């Protein structure tokens, strides 16, 4: 693949993997597995112990917007990247990871977001792509997820790290960020 041909490779993956637009969060996705084992939630409901999806970020959908899950969310970069991954845990400092395959540059292919952490991802190179597999445990359900950073979380974290600016928070809440990186 030619450098800068992230859209071409993303389109190949979208077709090969049978992906669709991920509503709300953005990116391209498809459910690929759901555990036959169930777990009981505190409210008495039973859910599959986990589910797993393909997620692709592409130049036309470079951001996976702010969202928070009531489940742990494990992301593994399969191909492409790097990807900036910002986590806002319910307690403790915000952190930023770079998902990639070059450990000498501090990149990691695996990021784990604990339940209750606000998370957002974006391509470091807007012309690149990333293929990520994510496993959520207990399984993802729409009623146990929120999309779009809420005012309380925003006010709690903005400026708490030198890099955690209002502009960054805004960019990660927009499918098509407008600010240069």
Q: What does each of the following model-derived ranges do?
A:
Residues 1-111, 120-121, 127-128, 138-141, ...:
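Non-catalytic, conserved peripheral segments adjacent to functional cores
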Residues 135:
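Histidine-centered acyl-transfer/condensation active-site motif
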């Amino acid at each position: 693949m030619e450098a800068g041909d992230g859209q071409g490779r993303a389109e190949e993956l979208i077709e090969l993997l049978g992906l669709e637009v991920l509503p709300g969060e953005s990116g391209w996705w498809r459910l690929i597995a759901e555990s036959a084992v169930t777990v009981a939630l505190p409210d008495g409901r039973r859910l599959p112990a986990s589910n797993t999806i393909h997620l692709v970020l592409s130049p036309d959908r470079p951001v996976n917007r702010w969202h928070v899950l009531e489940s742990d969310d494990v992301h593994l970069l399969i191909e492409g990247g790097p990807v900036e991954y910002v986590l806002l845990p319910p307690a403790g400092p915000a952190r930023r990871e770079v998902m990639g395959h070059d450990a000498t540059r501090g990149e990691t292919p695996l990021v784990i977001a604990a339940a209750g952490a606000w998370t957002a991802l974006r391509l470091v190179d807007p012309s690149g792509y990333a293929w990520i597999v994510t496993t959520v445990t207990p399984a993802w359900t729409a009623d146990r997820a929120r999309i779009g950073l809420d005012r309380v979380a925003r006010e709690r974290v903005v400026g708490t790290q030198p890099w955690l600016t209002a502009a960054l928070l805004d960019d990660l809440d927009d499918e098509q960020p407008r600010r240069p990186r």
